[in-house]
Amino acid sequence: MSQFPDAKQLFTTVTEDGKSILSIEPYAVPEPKEHEVVVQMEAVPINPSDLGLLTAAANMDTVRSETVDGHPALVADVEPAMQPFFKGRAGKKLAAGNEGAGKVVAAGSSDAAQALMGKTVTIVGGEMYRTHRVMPAMMCVPLPEGAPAKEGASLFVNPMTAQGFINTMRAEGHEGLVHTAAASNLGQMLAKLCLKEGVPLVAIVRSDAQKKILTDIGLTHVIDSTKDDFMDKLIAALAETGATLGFDAIGGGKMASYILTAMEKAAAVRGAEFSVYGSTV
């Protein structure tokens, strides 16, 4: 019998008959092997990549609470036009959750595993939406003494994404960055990293409150897309920073078009040679 009899896990399933199901089911926690530990999960973020697995197939206007195979579940319809896109996972019960943090409550016999007993660690590797996760000790990053799990639960996905933005900028020879939805958790990390590494950043937000978050961090070019002078300020910021690479976290809408248009106009302000085909942006 497992030493964690009440352990549970979240599963996501798209059924053959066009339903999207999120169910909470019992989970048999395996005994940790020599170099493994059991982490009792305390904080797990929801990233867009997680949402893609959890709810991308669902028409959320149809969501309802049901009991499926004796387990509590949220059920939503999958529109007929969407069903072909999810045929590859139809009928498959999938686990979700990229990363998270919690306390080590059991450990294998190795020195490395035993050294983590009782410590709060952050981990990555999928299947994190469960009460307990078995992981190799070498995959666990201990948090500082006294640090709560929620402070370390996003240690991997967003920080690596922010660093990836800057690495891409440098690899492609750009001078600065544009980022939308810039007051998000990722956006704040990117802002701090850009300030630390001297990378010009133009941050696009949608409210005064979001703007204040970033100006308090120290950013200079924070532009509210809801204001009438948005395009004028965007062009001016791009002309000043020379930013020619954008990462659009919104998806859909016209923002990407606005940014590219502003980049063209900013290039003209900076004295780019005229071409009927536009600039090299």
How would you name each of these model-derived features?
Residues 30-45, 57-125:
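Glycine-rich beta-strand-centered segment in the early N-terminal region that forms part
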Residues 49-54:
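Cytochrome P450 core scaffold surrounding the K-helix E-X-X-R motif
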Residues 116, 153-228:
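Mid-domain Rossmann-like dinucleotide-binding core that forms the NAD(H)/NADP(H) cofactor-binding site
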Residues 119-121, 132, 176:
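Residue-level marker of beta-strand positions
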Residues 125-138:
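A structural motif shared across PLP-dependent enzymes of the aminotransferase-like
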Residues 139-149, 175:
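Glycine/charged-rich beta-loop-alpha catalytic/anionic-binding loops adjacent to active sites
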Residues 195-273:
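Adenosine-nucleotide cofactor-binding segment
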Residues 271-281:
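Short, intrinsically disordered, charge-balanced linker/junction segments flanking boundaries
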